[in-house]
Amino acid sequence: MQRLACVLIWLFLLEEQAFEIPANEYSEFAGYSNLVELAPDKFPFVQENRRYQRSLPEESGEMTDNVDQVTLYSYKVQSTITSRMATTIIQSKLVNNSPQSQNVVFDVQIPKGAFISNFTMTVNGITFTSTIREKTVGRALYSQARAKGKTAGWVRSRTLDMENFNTEVNIPPGAKVQFELHYQEMKWRKLGSYEHKIHLQPGRLAKHLEVNVWIVELQGMRFLHVPDTFEGHFQGVPVISKGQKKSHVSFKPTVAQQRKCPNCTYTAVDGELVVMYDVNREEKVGELEVFNGYFVHFFAPENLDPIPKNILFVIDVSGSMWGIKMKQTVEAMKTILDDLRTEDQFSVVDFNHNVRTWRNDLVSATKTQITDAKRYIEKIQPSGGTNINEALLRAIFILNEASNLGMLNPDSVSLIVLVSDGDPTVGELKLSKIQKNVKQNIQDNISLFSLGIGFDVDYDFLKRLSNENRGIAQRIYGNRDTSSQLKKFYNQVSTPLLRNVQFNYPQASVTDVTQNSFHNYFGGSEIVVAGKYDPSKLAEVQSIITATSTNTELVLETLSQMDDLEDFLSKDKHADPNFTKKLWAYLTINQLLAERSLAPTAAIKRKITKTILQMSLDHHIVTPLTAMVIENEAGDERMLADSPPQDHSCCSGALYYGTKVASASIPSWASPSPTPVMAMLAVGANRLESTPPPHVIRVENDPHFIIYLPKSQKNICFNIDSEPGKILSLVSDPESGILVNGQLIGAKKAENGKLRTYFGKLGFYFQKEDMKIEISTENITLINGSSTTSLFWSDTAHLGNQRVLISVKKGKSVTLTLNKEMFFSVLLHHVWKKHPVNVDFLGIYLPPTNKFSPSAHGLLGQFMNKPNIHIFNERPGKDPEKPEASMEVKGHKLTVTRGLQKDYRTDIAFGTDVPCWFVHNSGKGFIDGHYKDYLVPQLYSFLKRP
């Protein structure tokens, strides 16, 4: 993204080239002593005129040259954050108490990546407002006014991690001036939290100083923290109010608290107020927020095992790295190497005019190898030139060769991290040629990250290089903080959790989707995708996410209703109803700017340029193609906010640069062909549902068992009366390597002297696939070898590999598919949380077509061999509605009772009555042995048979 360095310096000089502001033409500011809380983007005395722009001078100074003569009456900042979209308004009111005219400067810092949306200045009742024009038009208007002596100077400059907005006005004695600046930015998640910074530098004591930060997050607030950034001076001043979905931070120091010391006349308010927070994430599918024709999809899954990584560090050791840069880089690398996981592989390439490698091949991150690599790095002595081309090609060769020779874990990710402080001086010098060489040689499973130290390096080149090869670039400032900056960046990419993440929105009425395909997802971050939809054609927006975790393929589905947010947004005055539109525009324009820098032909670049220009004008955003013209009502006095050539990529603060791909539906492996057994329950989305078969083997509450015996076409039922915590063997088939066990939970209290029990947890073990699956009433956990993946009942998702598929239907059911021929279905039974007795429990269903080995056993497994039964002598029972009969089975003659049991597959709330013959005494005589023979010690223990 183009960093807009817009510095407005307005010089209202009382000389020939400037216009004067008459002292007798101003009006009093109404409500001067009242700092009232207002709705987002609404402040007094200002014409609402939303526009975008940015600016950047080198330094920020005090509000005026004469501190004693000008009073800062109020300095007020308000930020409102709605679902990561922040709008900040800075308002300053000053009074000239001097008998002479005074220059007053409004100089504020805003975060890089922010868009200025409006600037308004009121001096002596004359109001200056802003409009967005195409850049050449804006410059022409500025030039016309300048020729008449009716403008100020036009200055463009850069700063470090902040951008400056600066304007100056000369006001007559007794005059009052008000400045107001609006800017917007998106909050990117880094290392597990969002960080909102407000730079406070009023330059003098303010009679009224007030900062309010309102945060509205629909997912709910997980934590909120305001670190001490003023060295304890304002301890206890910030007031934090944390709610479930809305929080407030206020900072209102009195004049006495603002003083640097008790008798000081200068302010201690000079720094950043920082607010850190994170949101709840109950659904692995992410949060899909849909409103007013736009949608935004936030995706930050947790509880996933890290994917092993193959990482090559490519370090510039040329002469320009001498001193503090090299020392800080070495210190950072030592810490980074210690943080590598044992399953990672790594090596180090260092280069000046020559290229060296610590190891010619990737090695495992053992303690011995890490210690040796740290010794190697400590001995580096910077000298010579910079051969970036050969260093990158060497690193690419090492990874390519390891991949071609099968030395890399197929489930791993490959990363190259380049650290350099300058442009090439040796070897290939042409940047476009280096970019082409890297693109031609790097495999499409490798991500290239570039860290540019200082300002001597061509940062725009590094960003093109990384964006084109599935990575990002970041500037590192060459100072004593270099080490922590390097370590912080590494921490952001140190934990890959998913590969090949793709967001699909298959509905035809969903359009203009931002980048929706990403090479990797890293823990602690967040992927954000936005788009448009036609509310007249859609009642809901469907999302399907496909991704790969450790040894597992994922398909995550969600549906979001159109009216879910309307009621909430309309009732909260601090919630921005346009947040979805603003987020979509922010992402789209920044991604287009990055695509423009990578455009392979002039024609493509012109097309992208045209799109950016139109969007910039439509959404009032100052980009490299537009400018902000600020003028009075007559239009004869103007100043210009322009954007100088500056670093740009997508998107400032983002960890991902993705691509756009066409949306697809659920992949074929996640939607097996419907069969009679597949119909045990609906899998995935509604369109995948099919009709359940009439006959399956199932276990529900009590727990009661319903066994369908196809030879006799009878349903046989029995209950098991055991204790909470006991684990029962349901299927134990060591020959096939299949196990199903269930752990009992009890009701909240006994009824009629009996405590009812239910299945609260089920364990499935597929030994040949080395896969264990634990399903509880809370979540679903897949353990595949050494990796663990968790899903929640709040997800609709598919997870699996070529042999095992887990399909979760939100809040209802889980289906396990083994080798596309064996099926296991689990239903979740929810009860009212405040029910005095009942608890949530699970039901399990097995189709009789599952093909176990002849040695299969367990309370359910033994009936897969379909024993013969004979029911005769049907007669009236003690209850006229429940007749009795005699049943011969396995050499036993039993008395059974005709009754009804519930089948919850088609009606999970009330169930469907199923007629069956009930066997008393915990199935004695119908099952082999006693039910206690089926107790096992662990959830994944096979049944030991005599």
UniProtKB/Swiss-Prot annotation:
* Prodomain positions: 19-54, 703-946
Modification Phosphoserine occurs at? S60, S466, S886
The VIT domain sits at 56-185
The UniProt PTM text for this protein says: Heavy chains are linked to bikunin via chondroitin 4-sulfate esterified to the alpha-carboxyl of the C-terminal aspartate after propeptide cleavage.
Q: Gene3D superfamilies given for it?
A: von Willebrand factor, type A domain
Q: Which GO terms describe its biological process?
A: hyaluronan metabolic process
According to the UniProt record, list the residues that bear 4-carboxyglutamate. E282, E283
Annotated GO MF terms: serine-type endopeptidase inhibitor activity
Q: What is the lineage of its organism?
A: Eukaryota, Metazoa, Chordata, Craniata, Vertebrata
Positions bearing carbohydrate: N118, N263, N445, N578
State the GO CC annotations: extracellular region
User: What is the recorded name of this protein?
Assistant: Inter-alpha-trypsin inhibitor heavy chain H2
PROSITE patterns the UniProt entry points to:
VIT, VWFA
Please give the superkingdom of this protein's source.
Eukaryota
What this chain does, per the entry, is described as: May act as a carrier of hyaluronan in serum or as a binding protein between hyaluronan and other matrix protein, including those on cell surfaces in tissues to regulate the localization, synthesis and degradation of hyaluronan which are essential to cells undergoing biological processes.
Task: Relate the assembly described in the record.
Answer: I-alpha-I plasma protease inhibitors are assembled from one or two heavy chains (HC) and one light chain, bikunin. Inter-alpha-inhibitor (I-alpha-I) is composed of ITIH1/HC1, ITIH2/HC2 and bikunin.
